Amino acid sequence: MWNTKGAFTTIRVAGSPPKFIFFKEHLLNLNKSLKILNIDFRLTKKIFNILLSNNFTNDIKYNHLLRIAVNNKIISIDLRKRSNPNKFFKGLLVNYQRTRPEIKNLNYKKIFQFLKPLKINFEKIILYKKNFIL
């Protein structure tokens, strides 16, 4: 889905039973982005519950990230463990601001070019524009 016309949000899932951190804000921002991109879909709490019913259990103490991506044809849902950040890493400063930063869009072609040569576990890109880290 990357590099298609669409939007995404990443929600932290924590605890047992699972809690979706800042759920309302994520839903609001995702729907606002979809409207700006002229994608005729709105993710409601009801649709969210239908999509994820029976996928979470109270037996697990969650520390995960739930990514929801939407374009004109597909709704993609991905749950992955939240990794602990490495305190020691090498940063590559890149003077770049993604297109339309007010929305979390799926157009990451330029950023992927910066990521290709990096060893992802030890090296990170740090985006900046006009002397501000983004």
Task: Write out the residue ranges for each language-model feature.
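Helix-start/capping segments and mature chain N-termini
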Residues: 1-54, 71-134
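Phosphate/pyrophosphate-binding loops at sites that engage ATP/ADP/AMP, CoA/4′-phosphopantetheine
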Residues: 54-60
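Periplasmic polypeptide-binding modules associated with outer-membrane biogenesis and secretion
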Residues: 61-72
